Amino acid sequence: DPDGPYGQYFYIRPWHEGEKLPNNWRSYFGGSVWEKLPGHDDRVYLHLFHKKQPDLNWENPALREEIYRMVNWWLDKGLAGFRIDAIINIKKPVPLTVDYPADRPDGLCSAHRMLRGAVGLTDLLNELADRTFRPHNAFTIAELFDWRQEDLERYIGDHGCFDSIFDFAETVLNGSQKGWYDQKPVTPEQYKQTVFGVQKEVADIGYMANVIENHDEPRGVSRYLPEGECSPEAKKMLGGLSFMLRGLPFLYQGQELGLENVSFTDIAQVDDISTKDEYQVALNAGCTKEEALKAINRYSRDHARLPYPWSDAPQGGFTTGTPWLMVNPAYPVLNLAAEKQDENSVWHFYRRLIRLRKDPEYHETVVYGEFEAYLEEQHNLMAYYRKGDKTLLVAGNYQARPQWMKLPAPIRKVLVNNLPSLEEKDGGILLAGYQFLVLEIGCSEVLSK
């Protein structure tokens, strides 16, 4: 009942056929954010995402009390914490009547634009934390796009709303308002500068959650490695560079196997609503079906949602039936059982990184040590220090060609190497293509330079 108390739990507005909608915002999944309320031809409701996901009205105190009750119900049962999805969208510039300049031929503007006019988000988040998370000492990590450096203390500082937020800065690189079909591949230098930029901004304010992929993104190795360069060595390099950053390393299922994007040959193979929308956007812009498929094959999140390949059995050992999405055709080779048997696999490489993080001798440095970029201007070299009670140099040659890297101090110990050998030369290291290293180096020598 839109006129009853629960009608105030949502954003419902009067509207009649032929009238202008309350605003021109486009849903994150395409089309207007306004949908006709079932059973009420004179009302529309707001949904920033799918029409089956109506937005809750967080301005309503009664609604917030219901949310707190549900959160505490879980925490009282012993739940340790929450991953909080899309939380930045709960604050909106009411009364929701502002139109923004259209950014596509459909006359609409991405709902993302409204976030700039939404003031008071941290007030809501602090109330949520005070009423639920803080009394339970719960761990919280938030999906929070478009944060500003001056707001980080309020988000993840000592008294912040959350314990951590995901670093998604890399996922929006080269994004285009026109759509996926207009996006350009991410270069190694763009990736490096973006990652380093976030590390410098966060510094010691708190801990970011470092990711290269998740359920909302394509496979990281297909996105951040140059096309055609998804070798096991390159996958290990990319994973190692992310894992060793200051912050909390997150691995998504299949990342530990080095899974890549698949090649969808027909839009019917896709389940994701945003992918279907972007395919249509590409066609509407004049792309051929082949060009539209190329775009979704690069950026669709369905790549990360395929059945997990447990073995080389039919359907990857996931099921004896028919799964909801195709199985990655690489499953005869890229599967958990095979990688467990191969000591040089991506799976075993991640285990080595995890062991290093837990090693009592290096735990303080890897977990709590400072980040400092090294040779940042050297093209396609991504290198940085982790400085704590020890000094570690993390380095990756982000290209297929070998390149020389100067050493700032003598090597005390090679902790991780994704290749069987290391070539020292002229006071440095000749890094092979996509070679990745974690080196313990002389701390006093570095400090004196």
Indicate residue ranges for each PLM-predicted region.
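Active-site and adjacent substrate-binding regions of carbohydrate-active enzymes
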Residues: 1-412, 416-449
